[in-house]
């Protein structure tokens, strides 16, 4: 196989808590005000990273961001010492403090959209940090995300970085969670599929209950920035009816790997027409789409959302067959598990299931696919990645010790005003940037 898919998982931050901040994400809303366990959340994520690295997959780590985000609190009128800022925010607007303490950057599928060098006219890997315009607690992530990505992929001969799109609804961009790449080997030109929820200019249909976070206009802008060939680029609208049922990103209803698209029967608007265009464009690259469509009669949209069946990872094994990585919730649901078991026994491309317990992330609405950013790289590009962010035995031990030293095993919203939590977080992140060799990427380090 030419090239590699490298998954960069987000390390859960110290302020991981359940605040119900994400309207349209039903798991997030349902678990509002529950007590969280940041230490367990971080360790569950690390176990997934290490298990996949041990199986021979290329696996990296993306660090959490500084939270509470004191600079934004100051911008919004809170003043005095950092301790005073936190106390004022808790007294006057605890919901605002909660939003500015969110650990949502753990879901690195929303960190950026990435286009491999094989698809870009200049032969470079392109990164555009997502503006995450639809949710305030996420829109503040883009600047630090850009800095972290530049520190990890810092060789301009191989990597091109773009700032997030303008911070307005017209260009609402949720990153790789609404982006699929379909083709053959990772190192060869493929078709990029940008999925959107609404089209600002000339759109026909949009959801009515929950917001469509991604626009077609955002996808088109990223395709231009990344110098993609329109002959191998597809823009597909997600079915607005499933957005209104809690499918807030496309990776909650579909997932791809190489030439395989695993998706629900109701995933896309005018689905047959959309997939026909993907097939035609893949055919020009001598690649054939394998669409695995799950019928509503087997798995309802509600069950897909509850179990995160499609918020899974599909990984290509050395023998060419594929493995699907699902959360424990998929195994606990008899109908979903029955479907998965039949699928892997059917002789198709996916012949193995791997299950992970990601309960802390799942209760906030993020499964295996949410936690990772896919980056397809060739041999030279992989060598140019900052090696200290790549998972191995040594890094796994170091990061677990780091979590043990700094993380709490119980956190509620009231704890967010604790100045000691802020100090713990800054000390932890200062140490982490040394471990991962990132330099000064956080506001408090500037």
Curated annotation (Swiss-Prot):
Its EC number is 3.5.3.23. Pathway: Amino-acid degradation; L-arginine degradation via AST pathway; L-glutamate and succinate from L-arginine: step 2/5. GO terms for biological process: arginine catabolic process to glutamate; arginine catabolic process to succinate. Substrate binds at residues 19-28, 110, 137-138, 213, 251, 364. Coiled coil: none annotated. It catalyses: N(2)-succinyl-L-arginine + 2 H2O + 2 H(+) = N(2)-succinyl-L-ornithine + 2 NH4(+) + CO2. Gene3D superfamilies: Succinylarginine dihydrolase (3.75.10.20). It comes from the Bacteria. The active site is at residues 174, 249, 370. The keyword Hydrolase applies. One of its GO terms (molecular function) is N-succinylarginine dihydrolase activity. InterPro entries: AstB_sf, SuccinylArg_d-Hdrlase_AstB. Keywords: Arginine metabolism, Hydrolase. It is an enzyme of class 3 (hydrolase). Pfam families: AstB. Homodimer. Belongs to the succinylarginine dihydrolase family. Catalyzes the hydrolysis of N(2)-succinylarginine into N(2)-succinylornithine, ammonia and CO(2). This is N-succinylarginine dihydrolase. It comes from Serratia proteamaculans (strain 568).
